[in-house]
Amino acid sequence: MKRKTAAIVAGCAAAAGIAAFAIAPGKASAGEKAPFYGRYFAHRGLHTSDGSAPENSLTAFRMAANVGYGVELDVHITADDQIVVFHDDDLERMTGVSGRIEDFTLEQLRELRLAGTGEQIPLLTEVLDVIRGAGPIILEFKTCQRRKALCEKTCAILKDYPGDVCIESFDPRILRWFRKHEPGYLRGQLACPPWEYGEGASRPLAFLMGNCLVNFLGRPQFIAYKIGHKPLTVRAAEAMGAMKVCWTSTSHHDKKDNDAVIFEHYRPELYL
């Protein structure tokens, strides 16, 4: 009986050790976190519910910059290796044209308009010219087949940008790339409850990602988790030092117990 009990205890200790290794965040100094800590970030720019300023449009980013908000934005790579700011993998919801954005050239994308307005899908360079360091940026990398090219070309653009930029992604392989090649950028693991991952993620993978058990790949310094219940593993990673970022807030009340807030459809103060 004693041997059996000892074996159970040893097994539990080993499992706890493996879990702790898997979820442990990366290290970052207070100075590295400071530009992003305690800030509100306009989700895809300060877009409007009436559609006059579509998400991820130059108008939405200009409005956010004029107030001084941080912004969260999404980057994709086009068929001709241009870095554009757009959220969905498919163009249809925002442009009415079906097709994956990575299969279109920039010239083809320039023919499209966002949500029936005169706004085009912007280049990352155009967005950065609008923001010009007015507030910090959380830059979300969308997963794609050409992850390496997306990361390399985006970093080449960011090299001379004078403002504060951190990166995040649902794809831990992108964080792993940054950990290895561009460790100077603060890294964030995007996550949500396992049952909310789409068909592209198997149940085991969704479980691992939703519980941040993939942190060992990219060692994120912050976790951007969907507002709602957080699994024990996520709270443990936060207790180990990961910054707490929530998305997507639609209420002032969401600032409680968070270090930064990604928001939309209301106007908070600049700081938590």
Where are the language model's segments positioned?
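Phosphate-group recognition and catalysis centered on beta-loop-alpha active-site segments
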Residues: 2-272
